[in-house]
C-alpha cells in the first residue's frame, strides 16, 4: 500500500535532507541485518490485488472515491487512477489450509466491493489490462486526488526534462504513441504475491523469485490487448516499464528486472536504491530512524519486478518480505490463488536446494527468459538450469509443477489444499488456456470488439470458474 504525503511541492533543501536521512537509515538497516535485529519467523504469505471499476458500457468508471467512502476498510485503498482499487488480504502462516484462507479473505473483500460498486452502476474487474481502456481514459482528470500521485507525476517528468513518454511496444502487432503524464501506469493491474523471509535465507529466496519470474508471467498471462492492439501475452510488462521510463541507464530504470542476482545480502538492493536512484518524493517525516520511513518511501518508488520490503507488525517487530510483482490480476480469485500456490511452493523448493540453482543459469538468460515469457506466454522457448532449451509450458509441466508440490508439502500445506490449488494450475497447463489465450480466442471467434470481449470476460469471471474452463 502506498504512503500519502503532506505536500506535492518540494524545495532543493527537501531533497538534500531526505537524501541524508535515507543514507542514515540505509546504514542502520545494514547494521540491523548483520546484528540479528530481525527475528526468525514462520513462512508467511499475503497478497495485494489491483482491480478496475467498470461501468455499464464496460469502460473504466472513475468512481473509486464514492466506493471508498462506503467501504471504509483499511484493506481497500485507492490506486493511481479513480477507476482502480487495491484490495489487500490478511497475511497467514503458510501451513494447513492457508491457501483457502487467503482465497476466502479475498472473496469476501471482492464481494463487498462489488456490491458497493453496483450501487453506483459499476462492477469490479480483475484483469491485467482492461480491453476497453483508451488513451482518453488515461488523463490527469482521472487521477486519484492524492498528493503523492500528483507529486510522482511531476517528479518523474522533471527527471525526463519535461519530455513526453514515447511508447513503442512491438508484439504480434505494433503500437507507438506519445503520452504526457504518469497515468499510463494505471492501465496495468496486478496480483502481487508477498512472502516473508528470514534474513539468512533472503538471498536464496530473492534469486529463486527471479528464476521463477519467467514461468510465473507465462502461466498467468492475461494482458494481450492495449487500445485494441494485439501485443504481448503480458503487455502489462513493457507498458509499465515504459510508463515510468526516466531516460537513464539500465542501472536506474524505475521498473526493472534488475541487473544481476544477489550475491551476499538483501542489503545489496537497498544500497543500490540509495546510491543509484534519484529521490522522487522527498517527504520529510518525523519518525525515528528505526522505523526506516524514508528508506521505505524511496523503495516504494522503485518498482522492481521482485521487490524487497521492510515492514513491521502491530508490535513494532521488523520483518523482510519479497513482493513478486510479475503476475497480472485475474481472471478469477481461484486463478489468482492457484498462481500464488504455484509460486509459494516452487520458490520454497528452489530456495531449499543444497546447490543454489541460480548458479546454473546465467543472469542474462534468466532475464531473457522473463521477457520472452511475457511476450509469448507458455509457448516461449527458454533455457533452464540443466542447459536444456524448450517451451515454457513443457518446463512447467515436467519440472516446476513437481517442485511446487514438493515445496508446499515441505511447508505443511494440507494434501487436499495442494490438490485443489495446484490442480487448477495443472489443468490450465494441460489446456494451454491462460487469460491471454482465452482473450485472443474470443476475438478470433467474434471479432475485435473490445466491449464485447470485456462483457464476455466479466460474465465468465462472475461465474468464479477458473479460466481453463471458460468457453469461447
Predicted regions and their residues:
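Phosphate/nucleotide-binding catalytic core
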Residues: 1-472
Amino acid at each position: 500500500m502506498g504512503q500519502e504525503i503532506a505536500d506535492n511541492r518540494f524545495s532543493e533543501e527537501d531533497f538534500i535532507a531526505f537524501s541524508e536521512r535515507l543514507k542514515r537509515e540505509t546504514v542502520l538497516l545494514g547494521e540491523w541485518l548483520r546484528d540479528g535485529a530481525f527475528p526468525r519467523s514462520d513462512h508467511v504469505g499475503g497478497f495485494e490485488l489491483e482491480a478496475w471499476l467498470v461501468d455499464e458500457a464496460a469502460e473504466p468508471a472513475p468512481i473509486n472515491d464514492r466506493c471508498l467512502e462506503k467501504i471504509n476498510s483499511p484493506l481497500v485503498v485507492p490506486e493511481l487512477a479513480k477507476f482502480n482499487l487495491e484490495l489487500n488480504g490478511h497475511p497467514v502462516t503458510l501451513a494447513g489450509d492457508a491457501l483457502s484462507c487467503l482465497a476466502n479473505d479475498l472473496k469476501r473483500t471482492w464481494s463487498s466491493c462489488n456490491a458497493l460498486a453496483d450501487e453506483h452502476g459499476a462492477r469490479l474487474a480483475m484483469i491485467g489490462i482492461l480491453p476497453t481502456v483508451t488513451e482518453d481514459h488515461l488523463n490527469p482528470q482521472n487521477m486519484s486526488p492524492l498528493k503523492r500521485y500528483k507529486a510522482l507525476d511531476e517528479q518523474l517528468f522533471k527527471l525526463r526534462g519535461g519530455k513526453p513518454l514515447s511508447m513503442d511496444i512491438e508484439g504480434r502487432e505494433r503500437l507507438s504513441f506519445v503520452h504526457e503524464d504518469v497515468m499510463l501506469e494505471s492501465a496495468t493491474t496486478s496480483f502481487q504475491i508477498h512472502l516473508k523471509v528470514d534474513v539468512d535465507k533472503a538471498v536464496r529466496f530473492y534469486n529463486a523469485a527471479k528464476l521463477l519470474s519467467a514461468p510465473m508471467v507465462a502461466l498467468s498471462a492475461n494482458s494481450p490487448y492495449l487500445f485494441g492492439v494485439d501485443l504481448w501475452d503480458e503487455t502489462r510488462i513493457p507498458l509499465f516499464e515504459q510508463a515510468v521510463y526516466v531516460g537513464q541507464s539500465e542501472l536506474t530504470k524505475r521498473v526493472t528486472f534488475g541487473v544481476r542476482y544477489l550475491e551476499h545480502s538483501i542489503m545489496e538492493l537497498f544500497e543500490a536504491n540509495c546510491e543509484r536512484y534519484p529521490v522522487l518524493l522527498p517527504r520529510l517525516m518525523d519518525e525515528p530512524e528505526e522505523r526506516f520511513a524514508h528508506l521505505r518511501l524511496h523503495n516504494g518508488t522503485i518498482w522492481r519486478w521482485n521487490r524487497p520490503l521492510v515492514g513491521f507488525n502491530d508490535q513494532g517487530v521488523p520483518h523482510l518480505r519479497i513482493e513478486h510483482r510479475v503476475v497480472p490480476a485475474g481472471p478469477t480469485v481461484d486463478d489468482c490463488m492457484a498462481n500464488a500456490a504455484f509460486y509459494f511452493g516452487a520458490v520454497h523448493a528452489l530456495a531449499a536446494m543444497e546447490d543454489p540453482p541460480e548458479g546454473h543459469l546465467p543472469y542474462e538468460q534468466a532475464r531473457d527468459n522473463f521477457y520472452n515469457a511475457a511476450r509469448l506466454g507458455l509457448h516461449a522457448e527458454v533455457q533452464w538450469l540443466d542447459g536444456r532449451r524448450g517451451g515454457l509450458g513443457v518446463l512447467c509441466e515436467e519440472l516446476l509443477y513437481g517442485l511446487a508440490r514438493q515445496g508446499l508439502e515441505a511447508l505443511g500445506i494440507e494434501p487436499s489444499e495442494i490438490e485443489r490449488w495446484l490442480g487448477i494450475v495443472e489443468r490450465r497447463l494441460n489446456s494451454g488456456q491462460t487469460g491471454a489465450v482465452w482473450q485472443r480466442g474470443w476475438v478470433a471467434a467474434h471479432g475485435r470488439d473490445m466491449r464485447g470481449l470485456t462483457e464476455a470476460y466479466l460474465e465468465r469471471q462472475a461465474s468464479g470458474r477458473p479460466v481453463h474452463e471458460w468457453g469461447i
